[in-house]
Amino acid sequence: MVQKEKKFMRVKEMDDNSWRRVTGGYIGGSSHTSLLLNHNIRNKIIMECVGRLRSVDHDCIVVCGTSGLMVGPQVSEILQKNLVIVRKEHDNSYSDFCIEGAYSPRFVILDDLICSGKTIDYILRVIHNEYYRVECVGAYFYLQDQCAYQNCPEKFVTKYNINYL
């Protein structure tokens, strides 16, 4: 069987987006990751998250994946909330733990909602399987304009509770 050579996009082939240009270089990568790698845009996203989540009654912030780890730690630090990281399914990692961080009963999910939206279902399933008395009080989608769900109602969905029997 002949394997096709994987073609990688070259930086010069990318759209000429001004936000990709930074001091000393050009941010390469997928559009949503590149947005978060631009520190000016990432800081605006972080402050928007903080502003929206400050009044929400929760104990911790849950993230999953690389983009979540670019935003979640700063948001949780500013809000003085615990941070919980849920590893993606089949993640080849040095850790044997699927969930890492300080357990808290009321949590908010921070997610980019880029692909299929299955991350939210996965996070809820994993946390509810691990901990019995937890409540997801909401999910905040910080890249709504990049959202895979074009019919996404609003960025913060209060009482985003799913019961798993």
For each predicted feature, which ranges?
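PRPP-associated nucleotide enzymes
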Residues: 1-165
